[in-house]
């Protein structure tokens, strides 16, 4: 199930240890509400793998994601300074950072850093019928494209995802100074089953 976040969180391990954080049918959720806005400065995963466990009954499908920022109303704006994943193997069925619903309240993430990660999906065609972008922030209220850096990472076999960053709608705020940098990355069989985006 979901774990509601109200403070910053970091999953850290020593280099070379690489423990695994298992998530199934849920994940961490941020849900700002009037008079109850979480104070979250960072969400960090470093030297920790993130996976959905293999269990009888198949994958949890699109209900499994690392961080979900829920729909919220006007007057509940929230700013997260950084979302970082470094040195991690990620095996999830649908997405890592999910902001699927249009919101009147604004969620701003100042910096997104993905480095030295190996990212793949769970391609269980019976239970995984929807996949989203690795970062899926495509609608109104998703102000996350300010400073995105993806380096030294491999993205592979996520067949029905609409691209690594989803397909943005015209309502997504993007400033003139925004920058998205991708360097030294490999993409293989990502979104190969989508006929259009």
Predicted regions mapped to residue ranges:
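Extracellular beta-strand-rich solenoid/capping regions of secreted or surface-exposed proteins
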Residues: 2-12, 21-79
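Right-handed parallel beta-helix
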Residues: 8, 40-52, 79-92, 107-127, ...
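Extracellular beta-strand-rich, repetitive "passenger/adhesive" scaffolds
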Residues: 13-19, 48, 142, 174
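Structural detector of coil-to-beta-strand junctions
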Residues: 27-29, 56, 61-68, 96-98, ...
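Long hydrophobic alpha-helices with heptad-repeat/coiled-coil character
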Residues: 50, 60-64, 72, 163, ...
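Extended alpha-helical scaffolding regions
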Residues: 68-77, 96-106
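Flexible gly/pro/ser-rich segments immediately N-terminal to CXXCH heme-c attachment motifs
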Residues: 102-105, 139-141, 168-174
């Amino acid at each position: 199930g979901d774990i509601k976040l109200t403070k910053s969180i970091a999953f850290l391990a020593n280099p070379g240890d690489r423990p695994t954080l298992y998530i199934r049918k849920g994940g961490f959720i941020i849900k700002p509400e009037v008079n109850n806005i979480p104070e979250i400065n960072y969400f960090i995963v470093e030297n920790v793998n993130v996976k959905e466990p293999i269990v009888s009954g198949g994958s949890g499908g699109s209900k499994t994601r690392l961080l979900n920022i829920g729909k919220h109303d006007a007057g509940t704006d929230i700013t997260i300074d950084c979302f970082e994943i470094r040195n991690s193997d990620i095996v999830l069925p649908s997405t890592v950072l999910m902001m699927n619903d249009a919101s009147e309240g604004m969620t701003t993430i100042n910096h997104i850093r993905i480095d030295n990660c190996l990212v793949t999906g769970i391609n269980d065609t019976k239970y995984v019928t929807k996949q989203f972008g690795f970062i899926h922030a495509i609608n109104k209220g998703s102000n996350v494209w300010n400073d995105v850096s993806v380096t030294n990472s491999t993205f592979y076999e996520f067949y029905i995802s609409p691209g690594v960053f989803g397909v943005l709608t015209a309502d997504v705020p993007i400033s003139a100074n925004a920058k998205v940098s991708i360097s030294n990355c490999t993409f293989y069989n990502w979104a190969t089953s989508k006929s259009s985006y």
